């Protein structure tokens, strides 16, 4: 049963772009995206704070669900919609501070054991990846594929889920057939020949999520 220890999110978050700049955040909000994540890696809080603050302001202006990857203290300080954490961050993050601030929490997983860890934290949603090979980041595990993703979705039937990793426009229909509630994309938008066309096509397939 879906009883998160954090504020809930819609069962279907729809298209969920993960981008590394405020420029992309604003572009995608203007294009009608309602769920998105700012993922800036390997910078100190002081350097990244202006971007985090501006992204959160934009998300609020557009009524969007903006998640901040990793920088949970800044997310709390600037009142983001939510925070997304990797498995390695769960042990070093003050989850109660995120909860008490009223922020949603998303957690990455790559296998059954990590799903167990995520469920123990009772987050708002669980991300499942990486589904296909990806060049976006170095991955310690092998791609899960659609069969494994389907099995995880069956296990998490009443939990909001997000599929991520190597998902191109052409692969979205097959990914959605697994029953996953959201499709996270990176290069399918940021490396597209025409990002506006790609975003519109992805929104048509995956939707903007439930209200």
From Swiss-Prot:
CDD domains: TMP_TenI
Record keywords: Magnesium, Metal-binding, Thiamine biosynthesis, Transferase
Cofactor binding description: Binds 1 Mg(2+) ion per subunit.
Record-listed 4-amino-2-methyl-5-(diphosphooxymethyl)pyrimidine binding positions: 37-41, 69, 108, 137
GO biological process, one term: thiamine biosynthetic process
Molecular function in Gene Ontology: magnesium ion binding; thiamine-phosphate diphosphorylase activity
Annotated catalysed reactions: 2-[(2R,5Z)-2-carboxy-4-methylthiazol-5(2H)-ylidene]ethyl phosphate + 4-amino-2-methyl-5-(diphosphooxymethyl)pyrimidine + 2 H(+) = thiamine phosphate + CO2 + diphosphate; 2-(2-carboxy-4-methylthiazol-5-yl)ethyl phosphate + 4-amino-2-methyl-5-(diphosphooxymethyl)pyrimidine + 2 H(+) = thiamine phosphate + CO2 + diphosphate; 4-methyl-5-(2-phosphooxyethyl)-thiazole + 4-amino-2-methyl-5-(diphosphooxymethyl)pyrimidine + H(+) = thiamine phosphate + diphosphate
Function as written in the Swiss-Prot or TrEMBL entry: Condenses 4-methyl-5-(beta-hydroxyethyl)thiazole monophosphate (THZ-P) and 2-methyl-4-amino-5-hydroxymethyl pyrimidine pyrophosphate (HMP-PP) to form thiamine monophosphate (TMP).
Descriptive protein name: Thiamine-phosphate synthase
Source lineage: Bacteria, Pseudomonadati, Pseudomonadota, Gammaproteobacteria, Enterobacterales
Primary gene name: thiE
